[in-house]
A protein has these predicted regions:
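Short acidic/histidine-centered micro-motifs embedded in hydrophobic/aromatic stretches
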Residues: 41, 82-86
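Conserved, aromatic- and glycine-enriched, well-ordered alpha/beta core segments
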Residues: 48-53, 64-68
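Divalent metal-dependent phosphate-bond-processing catalytic cores, especially two-metal-ion Mg2+/Mn2+ enzymes
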Residues: 4-35, 44, 48, 54-55, ...
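Acidic-and-aromatic substrate-binding clefts and catalytic sites of carbohydrate-active enzymes
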Residues: 58
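Alpha-helix N-cap and coil->helix boundary residues
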Residues: 33-39, 62, 78
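Short helix/loop segments within enzyme catalytic domains
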Residues: 74-82
């Protein structure tokens, strides 16, 4: 069984667990996802990993296409585009703007505790690929802090995860208000989370 298939079935892109964390992230970012099409996008956006030999690189980046095709056939081109642009790397390489699904997807990673994320990544065999590629696969112009750089270079997967989650959290903070007016996304008060290790999360007001 290829690593992409394992990731969907019992790895970090597990249909049930990953979908739940994205829904939580979306709620923290934009309010409760009441539109059922959002839930289907949460479920299908990574379906293209099925059968992939690698999670990263050119092969892995095309994983956005299957979910986008399904969403497009069901709900039209706008929803296909919404799903397709959930990958930073795909969007950047095609000159596209990221969608809010991309931001929620990254916050879902940040919210995943190590006792959930690491066993899944080990079970599917994708952990070490992510560790090897994480230092040079981050999109945008941000850089690791000294503490993050030390952590992502650690041989301890727990330290690596802390460093990458910290870096990703800063990216989410910068991009959390990605606009999606064509999908009539939540336009009200969009607060954000005060990230704490495993405790309850407090919503902060949007800066005016």
């Amino acid at each position: 069984m290829r690593v992409g298939t394992k990731s969907i079935l019992f790895g970090v892109h597990n249909f049930v667990i990953h979908t739940a964390f994205i829904a939580l992230a979306w709620r923290r970012l934009y309010g409760f996802p009441r539109d059922p099409r959002l839930w289907l996008a949460f479920l299908l956006h990574d379906a293209g990993y099925f059968g992939k030999r690698l999670m990263e690189g050119r092969e892995g980046e095309t994983h956005v296409e299957l979910g986008a095709r399904i969403m497009g056939r069901l709900f039209g081109a706008e929803w296909a585009d919404f799903c397709r642009r959930h990958s930073r790397y795909y969007a950047r390489s095609h000159g596209l703007r990221i969608s809010r699904l991309c931001v929620a997807d990254k916050l879902a990673f940040v919210l995943s505790p190590s006792w959930v994320y690491l066993p899944l990544a080990r079970a599917s065999g994708e952990l070490w690929e992510y560790i090897d590629r994480s230092k040079d696969r981050q999109a945008g112009n941000e850089y690791f802090t000294a503490a993050e750089w030390s952590q992502v270079n650690s041989k301890d997967p727990r330290e690596w995860l802390k460093g990458l989650q910290s870096f990703t959290y800063r990216w989410v903070l910068k991009n959390r208000f990605a606009d999606e007016p064509d999908l009539r996304a939540h336009r009200g008060h969009a607060g954000f989370v005060d990230r704490r290790r495993y405790g309850p999360m407090r919503l902060l007001p949007k800066k005016q």
